[in-house]
Amino acid sequence: MASYKGILAHTNKWEGGLVYHKNEGQWTNRGIQWTTFKQLAPRLINLPSPTVEDLKALTQGQWEKFVEYFWNKATYNNAINDQAAANIMFLALWGSGSYGIRDMQKAIGTTADGIVGPITVQKINANKKAAEILYQALDKRYRLLASVNPASYSQYLKGWLNRLSELKPDKIAAISIGAIAAIGLIYYLATNR
């Protein structure tokens, strides 16, 4: 079963810090926009009247609650089995909201309503190539956004693609195989001396 803890380091790496986006007219801290923070902070981190200063002072623990919230929305409360597929669903929601999820749903062959539910999860879990299909769909989405609206999005394309490339399914599989091999080697060395 996939876990939001599997995406924390990746998201932490790519969501560097505090930025004021002039074109949006709002602050973003570690990937969380002010409008999102204002809406969710009362529920997620018990801030009844959040301020921009609260967003600027966001702690690691508070930030992780937002990541977990979006993970659960992207994976139907952690129901996606494959970590690679779940990571891409999270990235689609984290960066593009329900529009990103709709594109993932279209790619996987289910109704594109922007809400991950049992039918979307079943389609993902039943398809051995789901992670690769979702990866290609998100890559296509990023490239399309940058080509259709270059003034707003072309400046972000390289970063989006770099971020996505770290989630390429074959890279995740190689890391998993490498970890298993390392454990096997440690066990062998420990028991054969």
Where are these regions (language model features)?
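Cell-wall polysaccharide-cleaving catalytic domain and substrate-binding groove, primarily
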Residues: 1-172, 182-192
